[in-house]
Amino acid sequence: MAKKTKRRGIFLSPAIAAVLAVALIGVSFGAGWFFGVRSTQFHGDILLVNESHRLSAEYVPDDLVNLYTQRHSFRMASSEIYLTRQTYEAMEKMFHAAEEADMNGYIVTSGYRSYQRQQEVYAESEPGKAQQPGASEHQTGMAFDVTVETNEGFESTPQYGWLMTHAHEYGFIQRYPANKADVTGISYEPWHYRYVGVDAATRMHRTGQTLEEFLGQ
């Protein structure tokens, strides 16, 4: 009688199996999704998004509101601009205060942008002019771009000066300040503001830190 040979299988622990699964997914979508790129993380209640902390293609905030349908103390470049409700409410308070201080004319030009829309923006932009899909803060619904009607740069206007002095009081930071591109990976954008909450924004305003520096990233 022939001797039966025992077959030995390879058993992996659930943790190792999960790591291998992520690695295979990363390879199938491109090495950048696994090697050298960390997943986006919450630091407390602050969401960090940049080239090293990306959002998935499926990520969509669950509380987006259309600014056009809400009470607003600002103008809009489009009737299809969305932000999370918390971000909108803080922004409305901020621009209402600006209006009471005779700082008028703010125009919100951009808010939430889906992963798929960011793919289009990235493909249509010159190299270095737009973030890669998943690396844009606009996908969080907590960032917006703003300007005013001017023949000068926004950073030369009184409205910009008011924001630089008061934005933190409403939970906003200028996300990509001048002379910090080596930290943020993004050149100066005086028009781009991000909601992080009053406490964090105030602390960053006092120290001059970027979000990466504040979070130790």
Describe the predicted segments one by one.
Residues 2-111, 115-217:
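Extracytoplasmic cell-surface/polysaccharide-interacting catalytic and binding patches
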